[in-house]
Amino acid sequence: MSDPAASAPVSPAEHTSSSNNRGSGPADQAVAMDRMYRLTRHIYDLTRRYYLLGRDRLLDKVITSPTTATLEVGCGTARNLIKLADRREPGLLYGLDASHEMLETAARKSAQAEIKRPGGGQIVLRQGLAEQLDAQRMFGRNEPFDTILFSYCLSMIPTWPGAIDAAMANLRPGGTLLIVDFWDQRELPTFFAAALKRWLSVFHVHYRPEVHEALVELGRSGRGDVTFVSVAKRYAYIATIRKQ
């Protein structure tokens, strides 16, 4: 069900970088992400499962077939892509991440998963920034993607509008942009929400109301049909944007 207070449209703003680092260029941003995940990537999936809620619900919204192309921006360890690859008809799967370190783990995990399911879906991984997404240049695709995912990624991007713009530009008309990210937690106990926000800030993760507002405006502008679903009493939201 859609959240009645937020089932409107969307429209992002200017952009520069897609990492939580405010460095001067892409190289600085990639280095910052590598520094953050160099050690934690080894236990990332184990620790994140307890507070990155709604990821599997997001994946349930991804429609795949032998001919579909699905991209996850900020794919991290490829956890979500590996789950999609386990489907009987996963289609073509792609992952983009700013961190070389995370992609090293993603490549290893996806290779291990392929051994367990011979003939299953294969995952193409590339290093790059979200706002610089280019299907042809990065992945050699002459066609746009059918589905693009952001899973708890936009809340780590200070210049997230560029990431949304790039995703929309690389999505086919009628294609779907899916986002799961932290919400305002206003239906949760105040003490819990406050403690959660303090803890997440240690990892440079913040709820960004402006992201939600921009997604609402994107729908109002006519660029896409936008709906929101609450996860765990507004702990997080799942946004579905169908490109017009």
What are these regions (language model features)?
Residues 12-65, 79-83, 192-198:
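Conserved class I S-adenosyl-L-methionine
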Residues 239-244:
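C-terminal lobe and adjacent flexible extensions of AdoMet/dcAdoMet transferase-like proteins
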Residues 71-73, 77-133:
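Class I SAM-dependent methyltransferase SAM/SAH-binding core
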Residues 146-159:
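A short SAM/SAH-binding and catalytic strip from SAM-dependent methyltransferases
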Residues 178-236:
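C-terminal alpha-helical "lid/dimerization" subdomain adjacent to the S-adenosyl-L-methionine
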Residues 161-173:
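A short glycine-rich, Lys/Arg-flanked "PGG" loop and its adjoining helix->strand segment in the class I
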Residues 131-148:
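A short acidic, Gly/Pro-enriched loop at the edge of an enzyme's catalytic core
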